[in-house]
Amino acid sequence: MIDLIPEVVSALCGRAELIDLLGGDYIWRHDVPEDYAEQFPRITFFEMINNDNRYVEDVADASEIHFQVDVWHKAATAALGTEVDAAMKGAGFARYSGADLFEEDTKIYHKALRYRTVRRYEED
């Protein structure tokens, strides 16, 4: 299994244009801290899939890894989504799905973006 969480954090937090649009580094894995429950815009992300891939002689040669990155805002999410996309593509991910959603109960706009990559295992 390959852990790409540090790479995703680095890609998102390291993109100055994204941080500027957010008004700070309001990017969290899974849950938003209670102190920031009303902070918008914000981004959350999580790893969805991390599977063995590319078998050579019955041994996995790589890992296929999927992440979902969610943009949350009280207004349009397009500009933030564009910056997330650039950050993730810059980190070697390909977007395979994107959806514009609206959370009726909270009146929050939500852009759900899904990315995948395949990385080879390092030889020991």
Task: Please describe what each predicted stretch is.
Residues 61-75, 109-119:
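Oligomerization/assembly interface segments of phage tail-like spikes and tubes
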Residues 56-60:
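Short, solvent-exposed beta-strand/turn "edge" segments of beta-rich domains on protein surfaces
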Residues 1-55:
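Small/polar-rich, solvent-exposed N-terminal microdomains that initiate assembly or binding
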Residues 8, 80-83:
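Hydrophobic side chains in well-ordered alpha-helices
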Residues 52-53, 75, 122-123:
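Short, cysteine-centered beta-strand-loop-beta hairpins and adjacent loop/turn segments enriched
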Residues 82-124:
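Acidic-leaning, charged glycine-interspersed low-complexity segments
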